[in-house]
């Protein structure tokens, strides 16, 4: 299973198949109102009233082709916790049929400038799969589109994350 990450400044709202939004730790629905339609907002708000708000990630199936994923962010979250959130999201989307997800960075309520970088790094680390000796190799790929203006990951951070991922994957191959 591989992840392909693409950065976009904006995309037509009609193309959103599966949308990932970030909310505060209390799952305040008012923060996501401007990113989804009114009917979707009322549906998600109703479901939030009956959901277990102690979870970090909630997934709402709007219909057979569209999901909204809400990721809860604590106020003083550390970098390794952000990476764990990304890994948890990957675990949820890995077993589904859908292969396209749109992460809206405008909904990030955290002041950490490298939040998206650490979040994606956690997803990439979780996506590792040792397939060297498997006879049937799975060719499925998950496309992650990062949309919004808060998606600026510096070139230095991208190189750092890539080096960490390659080193980690190499060490896992040796073990």
Which residues fall in each region the model found?
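Short amphipathic alpha-helical segment within the helicase RecA-like ATPase core
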Residues: 1-175
